[in-house]
């Protein structure tokens, strides 16, 4: 979360409960904000993004598991909509 | 999915099974592609996006439910990463 202005959205679909919790912990530890049970958003440098993806790739994902990392520019983030009042954590968006 | 070049990612966190399934059906019917159990992506005009959000707002979401709609420009979509081999449906990304 230091420097850089690359915002990334990380969304995952992981079947195993303990692995799913582990991935959530990894993302929290990397300074991302939780916006949904399985979605985090954060700001990081390209190098930090690479490191994060390397850590995520090392996890023992099942055959139907998937993690998607989307960079989102500020312009797009401004056009984000939230429907429903569910709230996780703090911070953007 | 006709015209326009606004790509949107829709990610949701809905507790009730039947409502979650209903939202998935709505998004499929609107022509979006499923990329995860609770994430769809599609291309639509601004008007189609407004209509979609209006339909989603009419659903009886619970207090902790939340649907996030992120426009994603082509430049950002190109920098998208997928980790894991889980695959839903067809189409981008």
Curated annotation (Swiss-Prot), chains A, B:
This protein's UniProt keywords: Antiviral defense, Endonuclease, Hydrolase, Magnesium, Metal-binding, Nuclease
Enzyme class (EC, first level): hydrolase
Superkingdom of source: Archaea
BP terms from Gene Ontology: defense response to virus; maintenance of CRISPR repeat elements
Pfam families: CRISPR_Cas2
The EC number(s) this enzyme carries: 3.1.-.-
GO molecular function annotation: metal ion binding; RNA endonuclease activity
Residues that bind Mg(2+): 13
Summary of subunit composition and partner proteins: Homodimer, forms a heterotetramer with a Cas1 homodimer.
Protein name (record): CRISPR-associated endoribonuclease Cas2
Source organism of this protein record: Korarchaeum cryptofilum (strain OPF8)
Gene that encodes the chain: cas2
């Amino acid at each position: 979360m230091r420097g850089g202005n690359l915002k990334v959205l990380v969304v995952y679909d992981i079947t195993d409960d303990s692995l799913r919790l582990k991935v959530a912990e990894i993302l929290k530890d990397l300074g991302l904000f939780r916006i949904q049970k399985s979605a985090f958003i954060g700001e990081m440098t390209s190098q930090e993004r690479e490191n994060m993806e390397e850590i995520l790739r090392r996890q023992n994902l099942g055959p139907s598991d998937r993690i998607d990392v989307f960079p989102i520019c500020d312009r797009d983030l401004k056009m984000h909509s939230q429907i429903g009042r569910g709230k996780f954590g703090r911070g953007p968006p």
